[in-house]
Amino acid sequence: MMCSRCKKIHVELAKTCEPCKQYLREYNKKNKEKARQYYEENKEQSRQYYEDNREKRLEYQRQYRASIHGKYIYIQDSARQRNLLFELTEDFVGDKTDDPCFYCGQETTFETRNSLDRLDNSIGYIKMNVVSCCGMCNNMKKCLDPITFVERCSQISLHNGHDGDVTKYWNTVKGKSYCKYKSHTKRDFELTKEQYDNFRKNDCTYCGRKAIHGHTNGIDRVNNDVDYTVENCVSCCGDCNVAKHTYTTENFIAKCVSIASKEHSIPEGIERQIKMILQR
């Protein structure tokens, strides 16, 4: 690709070559006031350009994230923002993300490159602590340790008629009152209090967990484009709700089945972490 600034050929999947990007970073650092003034004077023009070229920009971003360099920069920036140790080289990230997903076996493709997952979330990005991980597994796993993640997927697989096993490692959630839940949601909420209470008392649709021993199930909207209606809601524990995210029921269960059917060589000594989201 030809650099848009110096017109020299470079190998990065970016409009500007690395030397020119470094020059521009240093220039902008030294000329912050000029850069701010330029932005203010051209704000409307820039906004219109981004609006007119939205699809083009999204495709470019997708291609960049699918490149080894783009994936490396993304992971490195993510680690820096979370104050995590990062000791990986770009070559290592490229080789590791070429591997199939450690959890489900999904391959890296030209369109979508796998990312990295830290096996032990108390440790940063070092070679012995990272595995290749597809975007969906990474999003479903959140802050769980790998054993708990695989075991939960195994129970979901079993509950939906496939091979699997049950696990005791789930998070206990008390839930919210009808009024509090209704006031906090940003969607139209058409459920009555009686309907809401019935959903909370029923078993989780995805994993089968019962609302006992201080645990209360919640509600999942089957179609995330539709509001809280009786037809669109099912009983769902908090852990399955977070893991399912905005995925379809079919894709969520299929991913759990893929994970449950795969063998995993997980190192010993990793502490259990049953909460999916941790406060940092």
Stretch-by-stretch model annotation:
Residues M1-F110, I126, G135, N139-T205, ...:
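Contiguous alpha-helical segments
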Residues I9-T16, S115, L119-V130, G218, ...:
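Short linker/helix segments within small regulatory modules
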